[in-house]
Amino acid sequence: ERGKQPSFLLEDSGYGEQYHDKWFALEYHQAHKPVLEQTEAVGHAVRAMYLYSGMADLAKASGDEALFNALKVLWTDVTTKKMYITGAIGSDEHGEGFSIAYDLPNDRAYAETCASIGLFMWARRMLKLEWNSNYADVMEIALYNGISSGMSEDGKQYFYVNPLEVNPAKVHQR
């Protein structure tokens, strides 16, 4: 009965088979597979971080070990194959999201400030689920290299993207 088990992820598990989006595939929205079957971070990086943060909140509230294990698999994928040394994520400028494993270009890095904020949020929630210094390390890296560096000193302006290498002649294109 609806409302007895308030987990949107379970209620919505059959969604997606008939979905057709003119502009974005299901991967963009992380809706290509049920979350428990996802093993690779795909699609829009900020959306993924919000989804994974929500999954972590649900795992914490419900004690769902399968959900936590799925999160650990996604965590490993993001932090070992799709994260820059600066803690930035989302290397693909087309779709503002994840690319293939180890595709981390310095000059074309999208690496949104928002994605670093999302990564920090997800890492904090993972740390609440499991005392593991890896989560705290990623929080620190994201905070100092992706969040604070994405804001002006007065806090009134932000960098949208944070590439590791910039060609001054092409800055206006981004």
Report the location of each language-model feature.
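Glycan-recognition and catalytic cores of secretory/periplasmic carbohydrate-active enzymes
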Residues: 1-174
